[in-house]
Every structure is written in structure tokens, then in C-alpha cells.
Amino acid sequence: MGPASGSVARQDWAAFARRFLRTAIGLLAGYLTLAVLIDPYDSGRSTLFSAGAVRPQGPRTAAASRGRDPAFAGAVFGNSHIQLIEPARLTAATGIPFVQLSVPGTGPGEQLALFGWFLRHHPAPQAVILSVDDFWCTDDPALPNDKPFPFWLYSPDPLAYLRGLLRFSVAQEVVGRIGWLFGARRKRAVADGWSDYELDFLKRGTLDDERLRVMRETPVPDAAAPGKAGPDFPAADRLGTALAALPAETAVVLVFPPVYAAGLPRPGTPRAKAEAACRNAAAATLQRHRRSALIDARRERPALHDPGLFFDQTHYRHALARPLADEIAAALVRLRGTP
């Protein structure tokens, strides 16, 4: 091959590379345009194909649609430790239309992201309920969690959203939503976000599982949990900042969810002192918002010693969840009646 033919070959490869690059960029731009217009999780960033709902899916992504739904004026935030609080029960007792935005397996970082999303779409909510459990006791300001969460979906940064749309799982949902939007019989995810995990636990025979029974009855160690001994609790700091930004009329209820007796530390132990310090830091955030109340469902009482009311040390049954919901509702009614 002579110099001339080599030059031609290089030119051909350069032309091919340019065509390939232009094609790839075109396909990428085309996909992103389609994904933005379809808005796979009904985030409201595009309303061209908005159905005001999503097809049945997990709460990590379904919360994008629920959290912006103007039908709701109150929300519950947390994880599975507050998931059993039924929004319809709260609504019936308070007159406030509630949505459940709790997401199992999440900690303060994810919950504060959802809190911010809800407030961007409901700048003056009538009420918010926040569950604070031991995940909030981390001393890491990054508020880490080992479970994946779509922070990009709730980010105010448009570029973060576009990067999130490039995920393969999201591309699958784009295709799925197109089929759902134009389907004759499309099932919708539950509008208020409530999911009854008691039914799931009972179907799995959790109450009869000896291994789980032993785990439930095993006392927690006396030593403080690693990374949760304080004295700094950055999640509480961020919560205080969020509460301070709420309108004065918004009623806030902070809940320490129930814990089975074996899951509570022995008084006077390092673990008890660390957990108390964490709860005190969380409770202190309520000073940043006057119309607020604290419900400590961890307080000593016979129900916390009843194994029939708990699936494990932190997941309780309706017999505890319903009275807790009523207690929350009563607190909201009192707060809303406060001048």
C-alpha cells in the first residue's frame, strides 16, 4: 500500500468516525428528547403526556408523581417504620388530604430529598409528619445509605435529571410508560401511596418463623452503635433548617416510631445515652417551627412488650399503627387550633 492509498484509508476512517459520532449524538439527543417528553415517572417536568399518575411501581420512583399531586395538602415522611400509618385515616380525622411518601430502606438523606420535593410542589402544606428512627443518628454528614435511591429524580438541577434519564432501567421505564399511556386498560399506582406491609408479612408466615422470633427477642448490645454515638447529629441539623423554612401555618408532627422492648437499650448504658442524645437533637429541631409537636411512640408501655404486636423489633402491626395514627391526628387537630 502506497502513501496515497494510506492517506485515503485514514480519510475513510476519519469520515466513518465522524458519521458514527454524529449518529451517536443524534440518537442520544433523540432518546433524551423522547424521555423528557414522556416523563417516565410523571415528575411534571413535561406535561405533554402527563396522566397525573404512574403505573404500579415501587415508592422510590412513584413518590415523584405523588409528591407533586395537588390533591394532597399533607404528607408522611419516613421509611417502613412509619409506612403502616394510613393516610386515609389521618384525612378522616383531620380533614387534611394526606399522602404517604415513606420509602422502605431509606434514611434521612433520602427522606429529606423527598421532603424538599414535596415542598417545591406544595410551598404551603397544611401538615407534615416526619418519622425519626435510629437511621437519623448517624454522625456522617454525608447521610450515607447502602441502598440505591434516585436522587436525580428529585433534584432541582436539570442536568442531574438528564443524567438520570440515561440509566438503562429508566430507558426501560420510558418504553413501559409509552405502552401504559396508550394502553386500553392501564392500572395506576395507589394514589395516596399507602402500602399494607402487614399482609405481606403474614403471607410469608413471619409470625411463625423461629429464626425471626429469636432475632426479635435478642436484646440490643449495651455499647453504642458504631457511628451513632454523637455528639454531632448532622441529620438533625438539616432537619432543623428544613423546618425553619416552613410557613408558620404548617402543622408539624415529629414521631419516634415504636420499637419492641428487646430493641430498646437498657437504661444507663452507652447505647441508651447515645440514643437519647440523638432523640434530643431531633426534638430540639422543633424549636425552629412553633406549630409543632412530638410523639414518642418508644415510651415505656405494655404494648412494647407484646410480641404479637411486632413482626421484628421495629416493624409493628395495625394494632399499634392505628392508635398511633389517631394520636398523630389528635396532635394535628390541636396544632391547627393554636392561634
Locations of the language-model features?
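Alpha-helical transmembrane signal-anchor/signal-peptide segments
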Residues: 39-60
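Hydrophobic membrane-insertion alpha-helices, especially the h-region
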Residues: 18-39
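Membrane-embedded segments
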Residues: 71, 77-165
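N-terminal Lys/Arg-rich, disordered targeting/topogenic segments
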Residues: 1-16
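Secreted/periplasmic serine-hydrolase-like ester/acetyl group-modifying domain
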Residues: 132, 145-249
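Active-site segments of SGNH/GDSL-like serine hydrolases
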Residues: 244-270
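Short extracytoplasmic
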Residues: 55-83
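C-terminal regions of proteins
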Residues: 270-339
